[in-house]
């Protein structure tokens, strides 16, 4: 089995994804943490069970990518176009998906605690079995899928989070 550097793997992913997928099948504990994939077009790549912790996919176009069981802790997906990708059983804690289009994706058993979904388009994505979605950060501009693709009793209404807390002296009290 060949050993590749992160830079060589990045080139494989970008230029010959099928060779990366073949190599990955014979590899254990693939570490692509802190890799900058920004602005890449990534299609049909198998990142299942890969450590992608703190990597950046900002401004990427990702289609049919398999993130099953991947460690996506603190990954940057800002402004990415993510279509038909599988995030099942992955860890998205602390990931920033602001301004991303994440459509037709599967988030079954995906841990979304602390995931930033500000102005994220999640149209037609399946969040019905996502874990800790109520601990994600989102705003009134987040576009959610239909109710049947959401967890039962999840409130999509924008709510204040810790970043919007105000000190008591900041609150104006009217005089009587």
Stretches found by the model and what they are:
Residues 4-176:
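Tandem repeat scaffolds
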């Amino acid at each position: 089995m060949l050993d590749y550097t992160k830079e060589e793997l990045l080139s494989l992913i970008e230029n010959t994804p099928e060779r990366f997928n073949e190599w990955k099948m014979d590899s254990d504990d693939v570490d692509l943490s802190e890799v900058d994939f920004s602005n890449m077009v990534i299609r049909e790549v198998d990142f299942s069970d890969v450590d992608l912790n703190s990597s950046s996919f900002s401004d990427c176009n990702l289609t049919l990518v398999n993130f099953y069981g991947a460690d996506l802790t603190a990954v940057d997906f800002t402004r990415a176009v993510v279509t038909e990708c599988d995030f099942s059983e992955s860890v998205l804690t602390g990931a920033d998906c602001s301004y991303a289009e994440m459509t037709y994706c599967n988030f079954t058993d995906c841990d979304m605690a602390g995931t930033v979904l500000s102005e994220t388009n999640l149209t037609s994505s399946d969040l019905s079995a996502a874990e800790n979605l109520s601990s994600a950060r989102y705003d009134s501009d987040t576009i959610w899928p239909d109710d049947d693709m959401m967890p039962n009793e999840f409130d999509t209404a924008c709510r204040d989070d810790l970043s919007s807390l105000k000190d008591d002296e900041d609150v104006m009290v009217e005089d009587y």
